[in-house]
């Protein structure tokens, strides 16, 4: 028995060592291929491209592959690592040689490096993340959250169809096809309609296959939908469609700004897809998982909904109060953002607090089961604020008041002051909602069903949620600034 116990640690060490070797070699191989491809596209030295791809792939395989437990998780971790590479390495090199340059000049240099961002995401982060995620999924036998093909096909396929029909009908009324921006201009109208629906269906179907284990409720589905939609903007309008159309790739800021409106369209579609997927997935869970008496809630759904609306309204009001000084200082409150309609300061503040209360109620419904700690509540609040900046002042508000929307980069840049107000509002709303919820839960933790519910809210170790927050927030904020 003693000899067996001495052997077991050695076997474990050898398995960990072999896993690191396998992940490192796979990351190295895919990274070299991706680095050489991005070197050809950007016309960079093959040696530099080789070293960059090899180094990124090797480091990702050694330090991040253990978190890539599925293709979807690997994809998100790979994209966030590629974004971090673009932000840190070139920025560090620039700062070392900046010699006191003005911030405006550094912003211009960052705009010049936008093609590198596209290359890092598509040639390094995406393929390396997916490859190591597939390897991790084959190696991982997750008994607690097994992958269900039926759930992925039903929820992903039908949500892609439903959201594609809704989004397609909405865009069709304005004769606008953002999901196929970059496609040939001489295409017929029926061809554009078909292609847009096909792209929407593809995004929806792959969403369920990639992120089934990661999404929980409406809030996380919308967050993952936002991040996945941003990736598809890089894949589709910036790369794939121009290649199919026979035009030259233009990854510069000027070229990408021509299809910036498509980015907003992709984000809105991602949000619609997230809501549709969460609805269908919840129906599946209710039918096949929560029908088990051991997993039933201790409270009725109506009571939980009413309580979430109450907490959300109070949290939203507090968020509106705390974000109002920034809104007043930037001149956002006296105006209906971007519409040129002037209001008195008192009227603008009252309208801001009223809207903040209603938006807080939506946070209570959408994100009530997402945050398990104070830090995660603030992160989801940031995502919530970013979502409503794209959905509110960029889309719904002008659409309701004027019947038109302006998604040009110049128009969106003028709304940047309200973006930071939305982020502060979202973070405060998320934190306040968590405090109210935790205060209530602390009085009912003796109920074993409450304890089980809290345990289900905890995300497993290595969850890609932090990577999603970094990727979605980073690009959701950076792209409007770069294109302004």
For the regions a language model picked out, list residue spans one by one.
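Juxtamembrane/disordered regions of integral membrane proteins
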Residues: 2-484
């Amino acid at each position: 028995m003693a000899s067996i116990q001495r052997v077991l640690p050695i076997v474990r060490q050898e398995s960990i060592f072999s896993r690191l070797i396998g992940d490192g070699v796979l990351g190295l191989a895919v990274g070299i291929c991706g680095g050489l491809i991005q070197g050809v596209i950007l016309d960079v030295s093959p040696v530099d491209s080789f070293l960059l791809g090899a180094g990124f792939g090797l480091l990702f395989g050694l330090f991040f592959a253990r978190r890539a437990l599925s293709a979807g998780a690997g994809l998100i971790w790979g994209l966030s690592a590629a974004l971090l590479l673009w932000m840190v390495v070139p920025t560090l090199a620039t700062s070392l040689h900046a010699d006191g340059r003005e911030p405006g000049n550094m912003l211009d240099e960052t705009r010049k490096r936008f093609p590198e961002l596209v290359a890092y995401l598509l040639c390094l982060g995406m393929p390396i993340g997916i490859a190591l995620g597939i390897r991790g999924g084959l190696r991982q036998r997750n008994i607690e959250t097994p992958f269900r093909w039926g759930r992925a096909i039903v929820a992903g396929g039908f949500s892609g169809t439903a959201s594609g029909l809704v989004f397609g009908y909405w865009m069709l009324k304005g004769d606008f096809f953002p999901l196929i921006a970059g496609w040939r201009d001489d295409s017929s109208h029926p061809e554009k309609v078909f292609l847009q629906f096909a792209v929407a269906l593809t995004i929806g179907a792959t969403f369920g296959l990639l992120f089934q284990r990661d999404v929980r409720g409406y809030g996380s589905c919308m967050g993952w939908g936002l991040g996945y939609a941003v990736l598809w903007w890089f894949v589709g309008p910036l790369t794939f469609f121009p290649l199919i159309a026979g035009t030259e790739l233009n990854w510069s800021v000027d070229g990408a700004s021509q299809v910036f409106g498509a980015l907003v369209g992709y984000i809105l579609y991602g949000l619609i897809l997230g809501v549709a997927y969460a609805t269908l997935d919840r129906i599946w869970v209710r039918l096949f998982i929560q029908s088990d008496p051991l997993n039933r809630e201790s409270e009725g759904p109506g009571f939980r909904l009413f309580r979430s609306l109450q907490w959300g309204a109070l949290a939203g009001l507090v968020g509106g109060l705390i974000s109002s000084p920034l809104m007043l200082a930037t001149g956002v409150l006296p105006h209906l953002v971007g519409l040129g309609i002037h209001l008195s300061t008192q009227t603008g503040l009252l309208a801001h607090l009223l809207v903040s209360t209603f938006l807080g109620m939506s946070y209570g419904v959408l994100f009530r089961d997402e945050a398990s700690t104070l830090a995660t509540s603030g992160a989801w609040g940031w995502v919530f604020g970013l979502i409503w900046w794209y959905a509110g002042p960029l889309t719904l508000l002008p659409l309701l008041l004027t019947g038109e929307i302006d998604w040009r980069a110049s128009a969106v840049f003028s709304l940047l002051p309200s973006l930071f107000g939305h982020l502060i509002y979202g973070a405060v709303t998320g934190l306040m909602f968590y405090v109210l919820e935790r205060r209530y839960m602390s009085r009912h933790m003796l109920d074993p069903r409450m304890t089980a519910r809290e345990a289900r809210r905890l995300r497993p170790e290595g969850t890609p949620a932090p990577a999603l927050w970094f990727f979605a927030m980073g690009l959701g904020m950076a792209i409007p600034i770069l294109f302004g």
